[in-house]
Amino acid sequence: SDFLIEVDITPNRADACSHYGVARDLYAWLVQNGYETSLHRPSCDSFAVDNEDFPFEVEVVATEGCPRYCALSLTGCEVKESPEWLQDKLRVIGLRPINNIVDITNYVMMAYGQPLHCFDADMVAGKKVVVKTLPEGTPFVTLDGVEHKLSDKDLAICNAEEAMCIAGVFGGKGSGTYETTVNVLLESAYFN
C-alpha cells in the first residue's frame, strides 16, 4: 500500500510544487526534530552525452517570454505503452497515461517540478527550433485535434516552417510523439 498526501502550495513556495520538493521539506522537518533518515538522489553517472549524430539548432527570438530553452535529442527510441508501475503512479496523481515517452516526461515533471515536452524529432523541419510569437490569427492544431487561432502574444515553439507547440500550454498534432516516432527532441524550458 502507499500513501497519498495532498499539499496546498502558497505562491512563495514554488520549490514545493514537486514530489522531490515536498520530500526535501519533510526531510528538513525530520532532521530538525531528531529523526534519523536520509534523502537519496538518483544517479546520472551512466548517462552519456553525445549530440554529434543528431544536432538541432535552437534560437530564442522572444527572450522576454522565454529566458531559457534547452533541448536534447534522443535517437532510436521505441514508443510503446508504459510499464504498469508508471501508469499507476500517473493515475494516482490524476494524469492519464499516453505512452512511455510522454509518460516519463509527466513523471519527471511531477517528481522534480520541471515541465518537459517531447517532439517527434523527425517532424522538426530544418532541424531548427525557434521560440517566437506569430501573427494574430495564425491557425494551430493542438494534440487533441482542435484548431485554434493564435494571438500575437502567444509564445510558440516553431520549427523552420511552422508552430509545433504553444509554449508551456499545449503541443501540436503535427509534431507529437506517437507509436511511429523513433527520434525524440526533449524540451526543457522556462517560460514567463
Predicted regions and their residues:
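RNA/tRNA-interacting regions in translation and RNA-turnover enzymes
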Residues: 1-192
